[in-house]
Design a protein with these regions (language model features):
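Amphipathic, charged alpha-helical segments and their helix-to-coil junctions
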Residues: 1-158
Length: 158
């Protein structure tokens, strides 16, 4: 019998830390991009409103309609980027969890252990030699050491 603290490994592993840092970085870039576009849209809106009296009613309505479609496109792009980012990271997290499960299996086979329980589901264990957590964490870190994360938005690396 073996015991492993899956959550602890995910929390402490270098790969998950890198993934979290990258997620925050990409999220920040998306937010900075939307803020920049919002500033430009506010300027464009003020320009349209300031010219209201100088334009014909039809021209004003056309400019307003065009402006609203630009706002819609910016909002749509933001939602798409967020969705892509979230889906990418969920996919990466799943792959890392699957790899971690394989590492646990490899360690248990190497130590001739037939059953491994999650530490959170075990009430008490007195023999700490059955705790595979640190060994699994070390091996998981080694297997993910050369991992790189790149996300592409609209065919451009982020």
């Amino acid at each position: 019998i073996g015991i492993v603290d899956f959550r602890y490994i995910l929390k402490k592993s270098n790969a998950i830390k890198i993934l979290g840092d990258k997620f925050v970085l990409f999220e920040k870039k998306i937010n900075e991009n939307i803020k920049l576009k919002q500033k430009k849209l506010k300027i464009a809106e003020k320009k349209i409103l300031s010219r209201k009296n100088k334009l014909t009613d039809t021209d004003y309505k056309n400019k307003l309609k065009l402006f609203k479609s630009e706002v819609f496109e910016v909002q749509k792009k933001y939602k798409e980027d967020r969705l892509l980012l979230n889906n990418s990271f969920q996919t990466l997290q799943k792959k890392l969890k699957d790899l971690l499960a394989q590492v646990i299996k490899d360690v248990s086979k190497k130590r001739d252990i037939n059953v491994v329980f999650l530490k959170e589901n075990v009430f008490l264990f007195n023999d700490t030699s059955i705790d595979l957590t640190n060994e699994v964490l070390d091996l998981f870190n080694k297997k993910t050491k050369s991992m790189s994360i790149t996300i592409t938005l609209n065919d451009k690396p982020f």
